[in-house]
Amino acid sequence: MVGRDRWAGRIRPPGGSSLPLLFFEMNEVRIPAGRATLDGNLTIVDGATAIVFFVHGSGSSRHSPRNQFVARTLNKAGLATLLFDLFTPEEESIDAHTAELRFNIMLLAQRLVHATNWAKQQEQTRNLRIGYFGSSTGGAAALVAAAEIPQDVGAVVSRGGRPDLAGEALPKVQAPTLLIVGGNDDIVIELNEQARDRMRCEVKLEIVPGATHLFEEAGALERVAQLASDWFVTHIGR
């Protein structure tokens, strides 16, 4: 594992002060992905049996405050997390001017597959069960990757995602999938309903009342984080 910086500390799990603090270690890592090298933040929680890969949406990165919030919730539930950039800095610069990469779902999915294969070779993560958490276009990429390597992926969660962009991969997904959409995100609700109806695996559509696409309303992101945590713990967690 290539690490540039490392932090360690303790976090309190759900349930209050009566439970022991969980030890965690976070490393900045570099992930080979074909000709590209991707930067990521890997957090390992003591005793974790599963890891969740975060697949950000268009115009975002591993520094997404929403994904970081959800990741901390998963860490408190005893899950390891990997937040990583889908593009190199050079690619981000190109995409900022052309927008030609952010909707290339196959490229995003392949980057996720590369990251998964990398994690399977690292001592800290090779024995952990795997889940994907995708946002916006990242939701589609997560489903395409899950369909490509079904033996490796145990659960998928999509937040405000565009699963419709996964196209022909949808009926091939085997991992239990949770689709989370804001109640006021009408168009995306319809797209998620259509995608759900094409899937053959265990799939659930969860609507967060009063929430818009980015879940910026009070309590909305907390609800997303708890739904995701429950789904991953049930399907790949302890």
List the model feature ranges, each with a label.
Residues G131-G134, R159:
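Short beta-strand immediately N-terminal to the catalytic nucleophile in serine-hydrolase-like folds
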Residues G134-A142:
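Gly/Ala-rich beta-loop-alpha elbow adjacent to hydrolase catalytic centers
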Residues Q151-P163:
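A conserved short beta-strand
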